[in-house]
Amino acid sequence: MNICLGIITSPHGIKGAVKIKTFTEKPENIFLYGELISGSENYKISLVSVVSNNLVIATISGVNSRNEAELLRNKKLYIERNKLPQLNDEDEFYQNDLVNMEVRLESNELYGYVKSVHNFGSGDILEILVISTKKNIMLSFTKEIFPYINMKERYIVINMPEFIGQ
């Protein structure tokens, strides 16, 4: 299984550098894992600078012009799961681990499933497919709203009585 560590958002300058939105804890961590994978291609990336808490400017081996960099726009960059560090704390997990987990009410009743995890800049958001309505909702991924995660049995508990009609 591959884990997405970032996405190339746009070229930067005329010499082939790119901007990469990172999904790592620290933006510079995307450079710790060697070559990254996108489809059948491998990319060796090097840090130019950290722009913000989730954006870096990087060069890619073999990409030497803005036109070449433009062809990489929106490419997702992956790493093999087994290359990521083992997590020791039960409160630690990779965002990708949440996808397809059951979402249960505090009464243990099935509420829905996690479709994906997003971050638009202000924190993580879970996209949940609600079973009863067959619609997707997005909720801030906070300890108050999701007080318990059971990684072994693959479910999370939602605590929002005013939102879910309890």
UniProtKB/Swiss-Prot annotation:
Compartments annotated for it: namely:
Cytoplasm
Q: Which GO terms describe its molecular function?
A: ribosome binding
Q: Which PANTHER family match?
A: RIBOSOME MATURATION FACTOR RIMM
Q: Does the keyword Chaperone apply?
A: yes
Major localization listed first in the record, in broad terms: cytoplasm
Q: Could you tell me which Pfam families the record lists for this protein? A: PRC, RimM
PRC barrel domain location: 90-164
Q: Which UniProt keywords apply?
A: Chaperone, Cytoplasm, Ribosome biogenesis, rRNA processing
> Which HAMAP family does this entry report, sorted A to Z?
Ribosome_mat_RimM
Question: What role does it play?
Answer: An accessory protein needed during the final step in the assembly of 30S ribosomal subunit, possibly for assembly of the head region. Essential for efficient processing of 16S rRNA. May be needed both before and after RbfA during the maturation of 16S rRNA. It has affinity for free ribosomal 30S subunits but not for 70S ribosomes.
Domain topic, free-text comment? The PRC barrel domain binds ribosomal protein uS19.
**GO CC, one annotated term:** cytoplasm
Q: Which InterPro entries has this protein been placed in?
A: PRC-brl_dom, PRC_barrel-like_sf, RimM, RimM_N, RimM_N_sf, Transl_B-barrel_sf
Which protein are we looking at? Answer: Ribosome maturation factor RimM
What is known about its subunit structure?
A: Binds ribosomal protein uS19.
Q: Which family does it belong to?
A: Belongs to the RimM family.
